[in-house]
């Protein structure tokens, strides 16, 4: 959990927190494992998630390192520059008995690659990933914070992989995947024995690969205000329906609708109602 710091404002964000808040908003009981600094920024983040009713039980406070932030320069809209500040508090998430207990009784653990950029949080993450629960990897590749070895270890631990087109291209270079998307997803799934792979395709919707079958959705045409957090909303919608044992077709439809809905707002975690999602699906 962190702050996206723009020249004129700071917005609470970070992909894991966005996904967690959407899942909480959809009615699931979510606990986020993270760490904030003992500072004003950290306290403001706690106040922010409190509005969503999400538990703070597994959020640690660091007395040495500051709350996480990403410095964003968006003067050139075609070439937005950002710096993921390091080191920060969430690089130093410590393993404890509470995390051990909670990670064994949940329905699913959702994780990304950035949580593994520092040794301390990386060790904690891989202990969590030893838990016998569904593990969903939102890979969220951000150079220079990953290596081929780290990717191997993360992918090996995942049951479900969520990626976008750019990330598939990067993985194709690492693992010599076919150029065609369907073939690349098939080989990737075979390499790591995934339960399924989910890929977002921007304005072209999304697709799911499972057991030799690919299911595609064209997405929903909406008037876009802000795509920040749209992919996170998509993943939350996917997880929500997947854990509810819905069909993959219905799961993908709901996920695309929620991603499209969030793109019609400013910010990654807007307030919305169930009927807002249904109105998108009825288009």
Where do the language-model regions lie?
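Conserved phosphate-binding/catalytic region of the ribokinase-like
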Residues: 179-283
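Active-site metal-binding loops of divalent metal-dependent hydrolases
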Residues: 1, 15, 114, 139, ...
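Glycine-rich phosphate/adenosyl-contacting loop at the front of the ribokinase-like
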Residues: 1-55, 59
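Residues at secondary-structure transition points
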Residues: 7-14, 40, 66, 145, ...
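Active-site flanking residues adjacent to catalytic metal/cofactor-binding acidic residues
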Residues: 3, 34, 137-139, 163, ...
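A short, structured active-site edge motif that brings together acidic residues
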Residues: 58-67
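Ribokinase/PfkB-type carbohydrate-kinase core domain
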Residues: 48-50, 56-59, 76-214, 246, ...
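Hydrophobic residues at beta-strand termini and immediately following loops
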Residues: 33, 84, 217
